[in-house]
Amino acid sequence: MTNDSEIVVEEKISGPISDWLSNKGFENIPLKEDHLGIEVIKISPNNLLSIVEALKNDGFNYLQCQGGYDEGPGLNIVCFYNLIEMNELKEDISPREVRLKVFLDRNGDLTVPSLYSLFRGADWQERETFDMYGVNFKGHPHPKRLLMPEDWKGWPLRKDYVQPDFYEMQDAY
């Protein structure tokens, strides 16, 4: 006979979007949803474009945000994509949302396909991620720095970035 306090119930991590992707044959790894209850899914860079295209065809027609972050020295560089279904919004119904994450080995190939062909709004967002973290977006029509000078060395938001000792100050006059 077991005590009720000893029963361990495994929490199901996968959500409806992860299940839908799996049923369509797309490899994905569901992660714990974020603090807002948004489903978070890990995908490989090779599957990014086809998965986002499938999600767009299923109604996720707005790329709310694309960005990156550094997990720390020696760890991954992560690209994330927040997709939303923007249709007729009703006050009592929240739109469907999903966050996709692509984990890249910082010492490996930091290339992912560009989403510019699906979402024109990815243009500057991908350029910023390139500029700050060094992620290359294959197929991007304007692959150049956005915030830093073209001759800047390194990726300033990486946690292993070594700051240069000298900055040339430009007079505004």
Swiss-Prot record:
Annotated Pfam families: Complex1_30kDa
Subcellular location: Cellular thylakoid membrane
GO cellular component: plasma membrane-derived thylakoid membrane
Membrane topology field: Peripheral membrane protein
EC top class named in words: translocase
GO biological process terms on file: photosynthesis, light reaction
InterPro entries per UniProt: NADH_DH_suC (IPR010218), NADH_quin_OxRdtase_su_C/D-like (IPR037232), NADH_UbQ_OxRdtase_30kDa_su (IPR001268), NADH_UbQ_OxRdtase_CS (IPR020396)
Functional summary from the UniProt entry: NDH-1 shuttles electrons from an unknown electron donor, via FMN and iron-sulfur (Fe-S) centers, to quinones in the respiratory and/or the photosynthetic chain. The immediate electron acceptor for the enzyme in this species is believed to be plastoquinone. Couples the redox reaction to proton translocation, and thus conserves the redox energy in a proton gradient. Cyanobacterial NDH-1 also plays a role in inorganic carbon-concentration.
Protein name: NAD(P)H-quinone oxidoreductase subunit J
Organism expressing this protein natively: Prochlorococcus marinus (strain NATL1A)
